[in-house]
Amino acid sequence: MNPRRKKRLTLAVALIVGVSAIASLLLYALNSNLNLFFTPTEIIHGKKDTGVMPEVGQRIRVGGMVTIGSMVRDPESLHVEFAIHDISGGEIIVTYDDLLPDLFREGQGIVAQGVLSAPGVLQATEVLAKHDENYMPPEVAEAMGQTHEKLDYNQEQKSGGY
């Protein structure tokens, strides 16, 4: 092999190795920043279509309804624990160490983002409550089997009268 060909081959191999390394690092970074959405039932039994279950230590988003009577507050700190459930009956525990949103209450739809600290236990870093009594995050509405219903106004409401 002449020196010119050897130099080209070395350059081509170095270029392929460099592009492969960059692609690997990019995919690793994207995977570590990926937050998959799950319902409580999917956390317990896996997703219906793929059977994928979140692993302990994985960052995820969970949506469901706060179970009535499940909220436990620590009087000495901001720590709070509550359960969320979905229409399929799955229920998980969410722990949170910060102030809950003003609109948070039992029986309401929420989305919690955090790390799965144990099977069925989410250590939340963020809790989002719905905006009003008619709003539900799209992921939660889909998981709960609900669809958006358009509000019907009567003529008096449309004309501005109460």
Swiss-Prot record:
One of its GO terms (biological process) is cytochrome complex assembly. It is found in: Cell inner membrane. GO terms for cellular component: plasma membrane. Residues 30-162 are periplasmic. Residues 1-8 are cytoplasmic. The keyword Membrane applies. Its main location: membrane. Keywords: Cell inner membrane, Cell membrane, Cytochrome c-type biogenesis, Heme, Iron, Membrane, Metal-binding, Signal-anchor, Transmembrane, Transmembrane helix. It comes from the Bacteria. Heme chaperone required for the biogenesis of c-type cytochromes. Transiently binds heme delivered by CcmC and transfers the heme to apo-cytochromes in a process facilitated by CcmF and CcmH. Belongs to the CcmE/CycJ family. PANTHER family: CYTOCHROME C-TYPE BIOGENESIS PROTEIN CCME HOMOLOG, MITOCHONDRIAL. This is Cytochrome c-type biogenesis protein CcmE. It comes from Shewanella halifaxensis (strain HAW-EB4). The gene is ccmE.
